[in-house]
């Protein structure tokens, strides 16, 4: 199987889907690997480093001729022309956010494996490290955009406690998963107060125990509680994600209107559509806009801003799956590995993820029934 590592075209995206170390694992296993020129530069990996591990450096067009194309994010519109029948595209594809790309993949007969929908032992194994990074960075961005020079309230999130007692900011975090706890931990490290809004009762108990000695309040998620707590936020971070599907718009425009003027609103799951009615995707180079008097931060690829760290994390997580596909062939790998099967969103043009099918009102078939 010919494996290609392509350079990301998304604005501000410095990650690469495969490190030189992982290229060596593939070539040692007898697989041919091609790497697009400068694909790893943003993460600190030169072309020479890949060549030393057995890869061949190629052009963008040549990379897309591969049987298995390894990416970080969804293909850019300009790359749709390279899709070919039975080609496998691997990455954090977030297909629920774009019906256009899904229809193009269906038309050509592409197989799409989305890392964010791979579930192992009930957890989003590959997404978790990226969620952790996005959560931590969101807390930092909330502090940054709280400053007056960026349009914020002009508050120092840490407060001041030398001979005076000026309280720090309040972070309201919607959701209680990996991204949420990582955001909360950074906010606490900044001496901020944290309110977490979570739906699941078992998770609420877990969070209450986890933060028993910290300045954290855990609130049951209801529309009424959300509307009340969001008014307290200096920084509001939504972390709600439904793997493979578009989340509902739970944070309404009226709720945003009720927030403090100059407060900061961040939606970590914007790459899947987001849960905030007033949010729209932005870029790392132009990350914010103001609406209803609130600073909106809608960057869909936050880990791309710290590519060295993010690349190491995602490459460590995905290599075993990629090796299994290359060693066994996709169909046998799917049969042998239940977690991998959950990542197959489209198989040779057929939608095989229920959430994706529902999001775009498309026909769904269970993956094991399709490959038999």
Curated annotation (Swiss-Prot):
> Per its database record, what is this protein's job?
May play a role in cell wall synthesis as L-alanine is an important constituent of the peptidoglycan layer.
Q: Which Pfam families match?
A: AlaDh_PNT_C (PF01262), AlaDh_PNT_N (PF05222)
Record-listed E.C. numbers: 1.4.1.1
Into which family does the record put it? Belongs to the AlaDH/PNT family.
UniProt name for this protein: Alanine dehydrogenase 1
**What InterPro entries does this protein's entry cite?**
Ala_DH, Ala_DH/PNT_CS2, AlaDH/PNT_CS1, AlaDH/PNT_N, AlaDH/PNT_NAD(H)-bd, NAD(P)-bd_dom_sf
Matches recorded under NCBIfam families: alaDH
Key words of the record: NAD, Oxidoreductase
What cellular-component terms does GO give this entry? Answer: plasma membrane
Q: Which CDD domains match?
A: L-AlaDH
Question: GO biological process: what's one of them?
Answer: L-alanine catabolic process
Q: Which residues does UniProt call coiled coil?
A: none
Pathway per its UniProt entry is: Amino-acid degradation; L-alanine degradation via dehydrogenase pathway; NH(3) and pyruvate from L-alanine: step 1/1
Active-site residues from the entry: 94
Identify the residues that bind NAD(+).
Answer: 170-200
PANTHER family assigned:
ALANINE DEHYDROGENASE
According to its UniProt record, which reaction does this protein catalyse?
L-alanine + NAD(+) + H2O = pyruvate + NH4(+) + NADH + H(+)
Q: Where are the transmembrane segments?
A: none
Q: What is an example of a GO molecular function annotated in this UniProt entry?
A: alanine dehydrogenase activity
- Which organism is this protein's natural source? Staphylococcus aureus (strain MRSA252)
